[in-house]
Amino acid sequence: MTRKSFLTVLALLLIAVSPFTLQAQKSVNLKYNVKAGDVYDYTITSDQDIVFEANSQTMAMDNSYAFYMTQAISEVTSDSIRIEGKISRTVTTASIFGMTVTYDSDDPVSAQNPMSAKMGEEFMKILNKPFSMSMDHQGNMGNMDLSQLSDNEELAKNLNSGSQFAVYPEGKISVGDSWEKEIIPVEGSDMKFEAKYTLLKVSGKSATIGIDGVVTANNVGGEEMRLDGTMKGEMIVDVDTGWLIESTLNQELDLDIEQNGAKFPATISGTTITKSTLKN
């Protein structure tokens, strides 16, 4: 190879790797920088495989659901953000014992099936009921008002599970940097989500963050249970606002539920995808 051709190849190589070099050196200061009046539409979909034991029998259930939700920024101060929201629709499908039941809150026909109607009764406790919460500009949750929802534990876990809001560190971070945060998804319980965040990529106006978390609990909603598991995945956020664009979380959970002195072991494997778009 001549000296000229060697220099040409070297130049092409440097051009090829330069975007990766620039990306590795890029740093960002992530925080929630939204305005009062901003409205975000959410779609949350999840597929779960549930295996549980009862009466010495092992049973399996496939469960998938979609929630459609709106969150509006009602107030922004120098140290807090107030969010008002509601869930407007759910589509849920459950398969067990060879039967498949689907409930769509926007389709009255789906509620004609007695089992679907029973599912609908439960979902009506949370659909179109307002809730509110506050957080600081780094994503640390403050007050959460779910009093209008008669069955709010699952919603609380979802809102505060790490699938919608990352907790950002103070100051600038670079690709490869990691930080940790302990999250309590349900107030008054000992459930904990210990999350490790890693900035994986910055591209244009979006940043990709890896999540590697451990979930533990011994008591949830007054029910004695042992829960251990992992939640891993990625979330893409807007660099300018810090707000979620899309997240994918994979869950692997083992739990024992205690009722009347009996234990019911179960395993849950699933993937939850959350997408958010600015409406206004």
Q: Where are the language model's segments positioned?
A:
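Structured extracytoplasmic
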Residues: 80, 94-100, 104-192, 217
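Bacterial Sec-dependent N-terminal signal peptides
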Residues: 1-30
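Acidic, serine/threonine-rich low-complexity disordered tracts
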Residues: 25-101, 174-280
